[in-house]
Amino acid sequence: MTVILYCQYVWGMGHLFRSLELARALSDHHVILIAGGRGVDIELPEHVTLVRLPGLYMDEQFTTLMAEDANQSVDFVQHQRKVILMSLFQQYRPDVFMIELYPFGRTAFGFELQPLLDWIHMGRFGDIKVVCSLRDILVEKRKQEFYEERVIHMLHTYFDLLLVHSDEQLLTLDETFSRMNDIQIPVVYTGFVAQKANPTAGRQLRRELGIGSAEKLVVVSAGGGRSGYTLLNCILDAYPLMNRADSIRIEMFAGPFREPDEFEKLAAKAVDGIRLRHYTKRFLDYLS
């Protein structure tokens, strides 16, 4: 079976890594993972093919689309993306199309998703089952009633299944979506989807870093790096003031999307005992 999994991350990296874990779990199938944000160095299983769309992201207010390549207009990037998406479906004619968050979110990307869903609905690419991959908690909307009506209409028109990535004994969708009972397509709670840590990797990493058993390791992360500068800056200012600072090692990750000027300012404050980097593929090893 061929699965196309669409993930558009617009600020951080959490959506990307959740989608990557879903792709990893589909190990008996061929998965085409479509990523629409800025490139991040990730490890792909053999059964997963990564397709990067020309990057788009949202501004800090989440109101305006921005092109990752400042030399290209948003209109040009949008056209490129639509052409790529249509050609992928013509080439692969997948059995399943899984869309991360849409139609509950990512409505700014309706310019490419709506025409694609219309063509799928008309059978242009064969018989494709369409699945919504949904996070556990939704962001409240200013026009909640209108928003929920639109979501219900979209689900019933274009989608065959809703996957909710939550533990229903802890958190159910109706806590942030009042019309849960009006959803007529099947709804499945998958449990929380996250990377799995290697329980022995943390000790191995400490040995690699030369961190003794009496030395404390502090991991500081700002996620993707589009925000969090103030937090990182405060930690760098506070570190020299800490008691017994020589027994504390800080591994700081500013984020792969951090602006170069901000990274340079942080690097200028990184004294002995602090290592500053943009990103690591071994983040879970540091936490474990």
PLM region spans:
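A short helix->loop->beta-strand "cap" motif at the edges of active sites that frequently abuts
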Residues: 29, 124-129, 159, 185, ...
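Donor-nucleotide binding loops and adjacent catalytic segments primarily
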Residues: 23, 195-288
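Conserved nucleotide-sugar phosphate-binding/catalytic loop shared by glycosyltransferases and other
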Residues: 7, 25-76, 80-87, 256
